[in-house]
Amino acid sequence: MLSWVLLAWAVACSALAGASRLTPSVLPLVVRNPYLSTWLADARHEPWSSWPIFWTGQHMGMSIMAHVPSTGNTYPLLGRPHDSLGPNNPNNGCFLGSKYDASTTNMTYLIQPEGKHLAGESVKITITFLSPITPTSTLRQSIPAGYVTIRVEGNMNVNIYMDMNGEWVTGDRGSSLIWKMDNIVDTGKGESLYQWQVSRKTEQLFTEFQDRAEWGMLHFLAPQGVRYESGTSMLLRTRFARTGVLQNRNDERFRTVMDEEPVFAYSKAFNLNGTDDEPNIEAIHDEVTFTIAHTQDPVVQFASARGLTLMKPLWESYFPDVKSLLNFHYFDLDKARILAHRYSNQLARDAQLSAAEDYVDVVALTARQVLGATSFSGTSDNPLLFLKEISSNGNCQTVDVIFPSFPFFLYTNPRWLAYLLEPLIEHMLSGQYPNNYSMHDLGAHFPNMTGHPDGKDEYMPVEECGNMLIMGLSIVNSLRFPPEANTTAPWYPGTLEARDAEPDVVGLFPLRDLQTVGGIDRLDSVWGVGPDATNLARKWVEKSYRLWRQWTGYLVEFSLEPHNQLSTDDFAGWLALQTNLALKGIVGINAMSEMSRFVGKTDDYKYFKNISDTYITKWEGFGFSRDGTHAKLSYDWYGSWTTLYNMFADALLCFHLDGTEYDTHPRTLDDQEPIAPPPGKTGFIPRRVYEKQSKWYANVRQKYGLPLDSRHLYTKSDWEFFSMAVSSPSVRSEILQSYAKWVNETSTDHPLTDLYKTEEDGGYPGPNFFARPVVGGHFAFLALEKACNGKATDGLKFLDDKDNNSPEDIPEDNVHDGDADNEDSQSPIQDSDGSEVKAGDQAQFPIQDMDDSQMTIVNEND
């Protein structure tokens, strides 16, 4: 039976516990790029229950402990350093919970030792991991470093210890390391910093081992006033547990990662108790900040227009050397906090208005994961952003990975989306890719962006052409917003002053002329202001118009009836006549018609517009079930159904506003009047398609969300949010609740997966995806709220107005004459293991088309 003291202690822990609403299994700690990516494993348990992990799930050596001098007790806070202390150190504090926003993860603890002589003494410790997302400062976003701040509050003295090991610079535990302690002196401030520098003895450029970089250097910084030491992990931790201090010395016996595991440590003493003569009764607070950086030069190799190029990090355009960078970063903490908090706060406000409280946590969890797949490079004249296809195969700059992530970039900073597309456009304009459709990726494995001169990249021609055209027009539209629309955008720096590129600048979107606003320096100039921005958008389209037109020509020939090929959901296999894929291609053609009109190519505009209008009518007849209730997976697969997540692009690009009262889309050339829409035509994709799909999603929703299609019970979370964004508010709310339930209950044990089971334990269906940037699709609601001068969601209000249960007829001459034209030849619905889902199973799907039977959906988990 618990003593009253222990019972009170347990109640105190419970009463003080505070956490974010959603409880994922893993939380971000230091996440900046594909190689600086450390996460809290088992995040539903105490942070000392396991080691932090790399995004692959492998352990990362980082630990934090607290030592209380008055009792001699040592408490693990993060990682498992107590494994080094033996069984005689069972002390655990009270973990009060984790909280997170877009840039920050906080973990809070309470230490309150037992004993009458310690009555009333306690200390609260908060560890804050800050990987600041700064949409108004691309320079800061490009810095490969994060902050760790440990704040103590109370009236009891406490010593804090933190260490790291060589797993931060190699994935091979047999690698030989070198390290040193160094000082960085800030002559302006008169302050200096300690710096542990750790690297492989022999670096291997552009090489990975288990997805970790085998080149680059770890920098672990601390302020003056701390103590430091390197040496064998067990010895350092044991000595700290006994004495509470480190020895200010360096173990110079270089060795491999796990040969008497060398660690690099700091300790800090906090005197919160005062003195014996004047003890502190009231709680006081203090803190210490460490920074963790991983620098590489070069960062990738890229087959640019001038040939294979070793690409430097973007930060080198602003700092003469690494020490200058690290010094700036450390002392920039206050400004970085302000900018990161501005973004997090606005994101929370916008998410709350767009959906619900759960959505606030969803996008907060997503943000660092998206940017954790990217690496800023290029120069201030021509910045570039490179992306790794995390976990699925490691491809570079994969177009159909950028596409699902692009709502995040449109909402957060469209400039970064332009930087993502630029390497692809430059490479293909240079003639290094032989096919007449868009390439799938820039290289088989990051960081080697060597292209595919043989044209044998993964075959997704309709997919990638449609993706590039849709994203291209979205960038153009972001530049055509009026100034008042941009003042509410996350990338708005606080002034509408626009700064033009100088004539000798290579790129159209440089970062050469940074500005100071409100006492914060090194901010970007505003994106998308007035006629200058419109002219910039026009130049951007014209520069690569040949490619846009070439890709559209391919879609004209092949998108209406796509032959057997892959879509972005390549794990589902090859399939001909995919309804959703065809829709992407047709929307892409319509996007090209708009870009042609924008740059004054009248003949191209008329041609592509006529084609897209003709195709969309035929597509509806081909792609919908004969009773007109839902889209089929493919034109000739009767009894099937699919999510139409590519319909999101129709709304995002404002095509759904055509002919409506909300049609504020810039639609005229300088020298001609707009072409009137056909009588009675509202929108590009008919409204009835939106309405039917929204109703269908409500019918087929499962315990953990909306399945991708009728083949399996798995889903893709990015496409769920694309689909939700263009559904009725009630359907959106229901699916969002299912997704939030999944976040809280899933058995997955890595950073957020985008591919999961909607039933059972919500686990991986195989393949196992995790930490991928495609979760940027979770920002679909927010990107849509900002689109079309803020009118995009107004144009979807028709989804609220009625509940039309009578499907409109589809002209018979538009029904596709496929191979499987017998309505009775239906394919069974399959679970993720390939087995048929039968009547009476926990989650039933319709196994017949609605023409033949009345469908009943049973979901026992609702």
From Swiss-Prot:
**Subcellular localization, per the record?**
Secreted
Drop me one GO molecular function for this one. glutaminase activity
Signal sequence coordinates? 1-19
Please report the organism this UniProt entry assigns to the protein: Arthroderma benhamiae (strain ATCC MYA-4681 / CBS 112371) (Trichophyton mentagrophytes)
**GO CC terms, sorted:** extracellular region
Q: Which Pfam families match?
A: DUF5127, GtaA_6_Hairpin
> Which keywords describe this protein according to UniProt?
Glycoprotein, Hydrolase, Secreted, Signal
The protein in question is named Probable glutaminase ARB_05535/05536
Its main localization is: secreted
Q: Biased composition, Polar residues: where in the chain?
A: 853-862
